[in-house]
Amino acid sequence: EFSGASDVISGKVLENVPVQHLSNALSGRISGLTTIQRSGEPGNDEASIYIRGIRSNGNGALVLIDGQERNYYGMVQTQEIERVTILKDASAIALYGMRGANGVILIETKSGRLGKPRVSLNIQGIYQQNMRVPKAVNAAEYAQSYNEANINDGLNPFYTETEINKFANHSDPERYPDVDWIGNLLKKGTFMQRYNATVEGGSGRTRYFVSLGYTGQAGMFNTEKEQNYSTNTEFSRINFRSNVDFDITSTTLLSVKLDGWMQSENSPYHDQAQQYIFQNLLKTPATAFPMYYKDTHNYVDQSGNPIKSQPGDRIVAGNDKYINPWAILNRGGYTAIDKRYGAFSVSLKQDLDFLLKGLSLYGQISMDVYNLQKQNRTRSFNYYTLQNNGVLQKYGTSEEMISNAAMKYGDARNTTLNFKLSYNRISGKHNVSGMMFYDQYEYNQSIVLPYRYQTVGGWFAYKYDNRYQIDATFGYQGSYKFNNENRWGLSPTVSLAWYASNEKFFDVLKPAISNLKIRGSIGKVNNDRAVSAYMYMSRLQNLNEGIYFGNDMAQYTSLLETQQANPSATYEKSTQINLGADLGMFSNRLNATFDIWKDRRTGVYTIPSTFSSMLGYTTIYMPGKNIGKMETKGLEGSLNWKDNIGKDFTYFLSGNISYSKNKVIDMDEALQPYDYMYSKGHPYGTSLVYIADGIFQSYEEIAAAPVHTLNSVVPGDIR
């Protein structure tokens, strides 16, 4: 039993959560864990995960699946998960070296059990809709507000009353449109579907668990159906997993795990498709132009030639001020992405009781491969502006066929080696445990340099009479990011636990309090996630410019040093303290945990502001240094109730609370005229902004207020 700060959530709790990415299934279920989902786009709705808040520049948690680091953990089907463990304090994360300084998430998938084959089928249909959609004003309201804004700025009204009335009565919708862009291009809701089938069982020396799943998610856009291709945001994925255990002998266990998935994504073409479309949805007013012109008006172009729409090719409206959101969505082309992923691992566990009772050896090798194929199929389109004489003025060119853009390929391969020597022995009142390990993680990708981490470490625990426990943990890891002198870092920690409920004097409280454990830990861990690789080297950039000299006056290009080398660059250091308690009451039907903690970081990698201009550098080219200091404090707690009603009905209630606050201690900042302009004393990343102090109601208030230096103000402006 571990004495550090950790939380465990059963896979049964996650099994029916209707999400396509696992990160969203963890949201709100574990104290100290925060998720932030920045997009709802199908296939790209992964949430960022923070354990115990934001504590420095690099805050990502390390995620392992069955003991192996996996970059694509979110694609695991919830029906495949046995349990998820969150490691929080220094004593829990030290074994994982510089990669685990911000917390570790351990995902354990299911294994087979002896018995006849058991088949499970899970089918889900989920209706999804936007939590909140901005409601735009109609054309008449927009025109009136526009006029009011002009008057407030001392200008003449832009729209006449006649024009406003035509916007309102829709008598001429193509000259005086009233387009609800959001309502027309966004669906009220859409569907996601999930299917999963599992088979598990075993006989003799073999046990197996096999899972096959499918997830499909439709987009929220209303797109044209006349095209033979889709420009909507769509997503589908097929998952497979096979976990097989073989008892080679009574003391030798061989485990083989295979998993993989195939995923297809589709979206409107643009580097930031959804963001670009939403920007234009929100900024294009209802008065700008119709989505497209209809054939009922017998339109002609400048030469008098009739203009007719064709199947899949409408007469797109537009002007030189706004880009037609409908045309961006339906005429700009699309992006198709296909992703493929496969992983396998083989492990062998050998009991060594014949050498020393309680001794065992474990070894594992694993590899995963990832491939991405991306195709952008782009199309240009023309648009028309309706002139006062009824002629449609044409702008731009239109391609009949979508052009094939260059396909982009990306592939990656990870290889991991693990070896562990473990010992566990109980003798009377004494329980002694220990583990020594070696871990190597190597990453290879086609477009970046390969890199490797190597870690050795150990864990030693002693428990006396199930009442007192001490754990000592260390990790010693080397990071490819730094030079040889600064590459390796030691992470030592110690933790203590007192099982108060096992004391004799506690027996009188046992009817009410089933379990009480008081624990504490302190340790130093290291973090290299906030530092870019190879900062100990200079970086040079070819400027394609240079000096002309020689008999032929040829140009010789020059180089610019865009990064000055910092051979002292290294990892940041984190000293963490944790105090906590675990409480079980009423035969452990009610369980509670509480932790209070502090994390102080030194050597935070940052760009110094106090340097001489004589160096010839700006902050863009200035090398970073390990000079920053930060501190984060917090507390967290959880409360759970689980009980049965009869033999067949189980219910549970749970809740948790988390709080953390970060502040900058030192960032080597340049002198500022006012104290509030320093980062020191404020949370990391705090923005310096003006604070609104109401609205000016009259010119008298403006005259009495401090002088505005940014612009002139009138009644109605923010003061």
Predicted ranges, named:
Residues 50-56, 296, 699, 708:
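Short linear motifs in intrinsically disordered
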Residues 130-132, 173-213, 217-220, 231-322, ...:
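Flexible loop and strand-edge segments within Gram-negative outer membrane beta-barrel domains
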Residues 14, 60, 243-252, 258-262, ...:
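Extracellular/periplasmic, surface-exposed regions of secreted and cell-surface proteins
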Residues 1-241, 254, 620:
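Short, small/polar-rich motifs associated with maturation and membrane association
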Residues 120-171, 269-281, 642-719:
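Conserved small-residue
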Residues 2-4, 174-176, 285, 397, ...:
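A short alpha-helix capping/helix-coil boundary motif
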Residues 383-384:
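Active-site-proximal polar cores
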